[in-house]
Amino acid sequence: MAAPWRRWPTGLLAVLRPLLTCRPLQGTTLQRDVLLFEHDRGRFFTILGLFCAGQGVFWASMAVAAVSRPPVPVQPLDAEVPNRGPFDLRSALWRYGLAVGCGAIGALVLGAGLLFSLRSVRSVVLRAGGQQVTLTTHAPFGLGAHFTVPLKQVSCMAHRGEVPAMLPLKVKGRRFYFLLDKTGHFPNTKLFDNTVGAYRSL
């Protein structure tokens, strides 16, 4: 029977083996580009862009109509001008307030649609060498926009199994999270989890 002091290196190796195999693959040299994520929703974002543009035009026209002075009917010289009080919807205060409100709603709809389009990720590609990653977003009207950043500047804020719908991705130097829809395709889940899907302190 082996002595206890001879068995502990074997037990220690058995404990450390999963940790060694789960280390990030940042040092692994890739010979070619590898697709890590893909989710093409070009048609949806085209419709979303048209909807937001239509809403912007509608609310802008409402703001212009509100600020325009209504025509004043011709009245006899001896006619008495009625006092409508401060709640008259034709007063300047109400018209300018309504114009500002309509403009704010239109800007909010346009801004939300633009931001969602620019932060919804269509594909993630790990470049050859494993040190650069290219993110492609849907962009307004589904036209697509891409950029390449060092892998060390990308941090996944949650594991794929921890979120129900959207996977938040943080890129250093860029505001707001980039969103990966979990219904998309992950061709290489292990490589994704060890590279782009890993958490980093940025």
Swiss-Prot record:
InterPro entries: Tmem223 (IPR026100), TMEM70/TMEM186/TMEM223 (IPR045325). GO terms for cellular component: mitochondrial inner membrane; mitochondrion. It is a multi-pass membrane protein. Pfam families: TMEM70 (PF06979). Residues 65-97 are mitochondrial intermembrane. GO terms for molecular function: mitochondrial ribosome binding. Associates with the mitochondrial ribosome. The gene is TMEM223. Belongs to the TMEM223 family. Keywords: Membrane, Mitochondrion, Mitochondrion inner membrane, Transmembrane, Transmembrane helix. It is found in: Mitochondrion inner membrane. This is Transmembrane protein 223. The chain crosses the membrane at residues 44-64, 98-118. One of its GO terms (biological process) is mitochondrial cytochrome c oxidase assembly. Its main location: mitochondrion. Residues 1-43, 119-202 are mitochondrial matrix. Mitochondrial ribosome-associated protein involved in the first steps of cytochrome c oxidase complex (complex IV) biogenesis. Stimulates the translation of MT-CO1 mRNA and is a constituent of early MT-CO1 assembly intermediates.
